[in-house]
């Protein structure tokens, strides 16, 4: 009985020490540490690849090719969306499937959008972490863009430079 108790106590101690050792993925933590190292002070938004609605509109007007990646749910797509020529609609819960990652260009700027910017920030961070360096996030989401443009023109194609 004493031997069984000692064995169980030893096994429990070993299990608890292993759990503490594996509390988080140290390799992934190192990757995030490098990724977030430049996120400091007034330039934090730029380091996080955040773009304000007015900056986005100016880039489109100048003729920059920007691929909008809308990560909202299919039900949300019908309310209002991004009227850019190369826009992609991939819900965040489908985004990291191989066939969807293959749709995201690596040679153009990709602007991740959602309603408020929360899901886009998460998706953009994860995409950059796996190697998509050309990914940016629309600060404040489509709601902020609509507020910047105005209700009448928010869902119309943006004028391009001609």
Predicted regions located by residue number:
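Structural scaffold elements adjacent to functional motifs in cytosolic proteins
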Residues: 68-70
